[in-house]
Amino acid sequence: MAIGKRLLVNKPAEESFYASPMYDFLYPFRPVGNQWLPEYIIFVCAVILRCTIGLGPYSGKGSPPLYGDFEAQRHWMEITQHLPLSKWYWYDLQYWGLDYPPLTAFHSYLLGLIGSFFNPSWFALEKSRGFESPDNGLKTYMRSTVIISDILFYFPAVIYFTKWLGRYRNQSPIGQSIAASAILFQPSLMLIDHGHFQYNSVMLGLTAYAINNLLDEYYAMAAVCFVLSICFKQMALYYAPIFFAYLLSRSLLFPKFNIARLTVIAFATLATFAIIFAPLYFLGGGLKNIHQCIHRIFPFARGIFEDKVANFWCVTNVFVKYKERFTIQQLQLYSLIATVIGFLPAMIMTLLHPKKHLLPYVLIACSMSFFLFSFQVHEKTILIPLLPITLLYSSTDWNVLSLVSWINNVALFTLWPLLKKDGLHLQYAVSFLLSNWLIGNFSFITPRFLPKSLTPGPSISSINSDYRRRSLLPYNVVWKSFIIGTYIAMGFYHFLDQFVAPPSKYPDLWVLLNCAVGFICFSIFWLWSYYKIFTSGSKSMKDL
């Protein structure tokens, strides 16, 4: 009995989420013969979660004349089906003009081609605008394409990352599966892709593949995957300085000068871009069409930010009316300078110390710099820094896990105004509660309400254990107090938003309050990522 107790006490140091319902649900599959089962359980549960979110409304449902992102994606499937490639980036730009790189256009073409096989009226040119089938056939098809895209691009990349890291530091298979489930159950991505409606998981999955190839030291393949990510959604450029610095350093500085490696990487990068843009040149009208594509995917004329977003420009615009005091060209320059200053230390650190265990942190610092300071940022863009942030759920450091959990909650909170507009109130609340409960954030409550017969693992039923009396909070008192304070602020905001009307003179006051809370938290987390970069240089992947 004493040995068993000693093992139970030592266990939390080995597993990331020992004190969580997720650990307990997967605990019965610890025997060697059952270790393949957790992956299938996680896979099925991740798909079910996405399906249940998809049962709700989507962006722009029943809101003519422009509707929303659902209609935008459907419209791109429509025009790529019926128009020559030379018109894809020119057609009716006042409606939902195509404004993503060619890989998104080809993806839309393929999905539209398959969808037309089931029902051509879904994508009939011009006649299908705002189409909402009474039998929900179109909605079902569109939702299923996002799930399949998740399964093909995002799921394998995440599972591979957690397995690679787990094997590197001798983590148990069950620990690897728990880390994968925490990443796959991230609520923000699920709600935007499967609720609001987008295909961000394709871009993020391709980026994760690029990260995996860096870990495996397949540098040319990493470059190819990253270019594919950029060519699907240009926001992947938020990671570009780090990938550039890492690949350059690994070619010219570490372990030694290797011109052959640099040549192969450069060729792979240029060849991938050339292959993807070649159809626009040869089938779409030459350089004129490529120029129009680039003009569409970098819409500088729209302004420094769109709607309300938790970044520097939107929050400080309350005090300094940038659009009134500066020209668009000036704002472009200022945002460029601020963004470069923000990511330059991370880029230099990557160039001088291209270490694998620093990759998540430098990617966080770089992408968060773009989110906070760059031009034309949307609230959904927080999904870009959330990828490397959420990959840190593979960490075994309690403090890292607590901060990752907290910033994921903050990110979800900043998406509330958008999700509220889409009518995704229930999905927002349930996703927040479920994701936090699964990783143990309600551990101080759970064992007091669940009988032991419903707890298959050892930790959740141990009410007296210290791990069961605390939620996922850091050890540091200052951090703990600040995080609790932000949760109180978030709760207070939701109370105001639900029960108190904003002043008629300031109708966006509550939304700006949401942005202010998010901006403060994101800025502090961004600084924390730099702290980790400069204090973790001598560590290894085992210390991630």
Swiss-Prot record:
Pathway: Protein modification; protein glycosylation
Residues in the Cytoplasmic compartment per record: 1-35, 126-145, 245-263, 354-356, 420-425, 503-508
Reaction(s) catalysed (UniProt annotation): an alpha-D-Man-(1->2)-alpha-D-Man-(1->2)-alpha-D-Man-(1->3)-[alpha-D-Man-(1->2)-alpha-D-Man-(1->3)-[alpha-D-Man-(1->2)-alpha-D-Man-(1->6)]-alpha-D-Man-(1->6)]-beta-D-Man-(1->4)-beta-D-GlcNAc-(1->4)-alpha-D-GlcNAc-diphospho-di-trans,poly-cis-dolichol + a di-trans,poly-cis-dolichyl beta-D-glucosyl phosphate = an alpha-D-Glc-(1->3)-alpha-D-Man-(1->2)-alpha-D-Man-(1->2)-alpha-D-Man-(1->3)-[alpha-D-Man-(1->2)-alpha-D-Man-(1->3)-[alpha-D-Man-(1->2)-alpha-D-Man-(1->6)]-alpha-D-Man-(1->6)]-beta-D-Man-(1->4)-beta-D-GlcNAc-(1->4)-alpha-D-GlcNAc-diphospho-di-trans,poly-cis-dolichol + a di-trans,poly-cis-dolichyl phosphate + H(+)
Protein topology in the membrane: Multi-pass membrane protein
UniProt superkingdom: Eukaryota
GO CC annotation terms, alphabetical: endoplasmic reticulum; endoplasmic reticulum membrane
Topological domain spans for side Lumenal: 57-104, 167-223, 285-332, 378-398, 447-481, 530-544
Gene Ontology molecular function: dolichyl pyrophosphate Man9GlcNAc2 alpha-1,3-glucosyltransferase activity; hexosyltransferase activity
Keywords noted in UniProt: Endoplasmic reticulum, Glycosyltransferase, Membrane, Transferase, Transmembrane, Transmembrane helix
GO biological process: aerobic respiration; dolichol-linked oligosaccharide biosynthetic process; protein glycosylation
E.C. no: 2.4.1.267
Pfam short name (any one): Alg6_Alg8
Residues spanning the membrane: 36-56, 105-125, 146-166, 224-244, 264-284, 333-353, 357-377, 399-419, 426-446, 482-502, 509-529
Classification via InterPro entries: Glyco_trans_ALG6/ALG8
Primary location: endoplasmic reticulum
Function: Dolichyl pyrophosphate Man9GlcNAc2 alpha-1,3-glucosyltransferase that operates in the biosynthetic pathway of dolichol-linked oligosaccharides, the glycan precursors employed in protein asparagine (N)-glycosylation. The assembly of dolichol-linked oligosaccharides begins on the cytosolic side of the endoplasmic reticulum membrane and finishes in its lumen. The sequential addition of sugars to dolichol pyrophosphate produces dolichol-linked oligosaccharides containing fourteen sugars, including two GlcNAcs, nine mannoses and three glucoses.
Family statement: Belongs to the ALG6/ALG8 glucosyltransferase family.
Entry protein name: Dolichyl pyrophosphate Man9GlcNAc2 alpha-1,3-glucosyltransferase
Origin species: Saccharomyces cerevisiae (strain ATCC 204508 / S288c) (Baker's yeast)
Recorded name of the encoding gene: ALG6
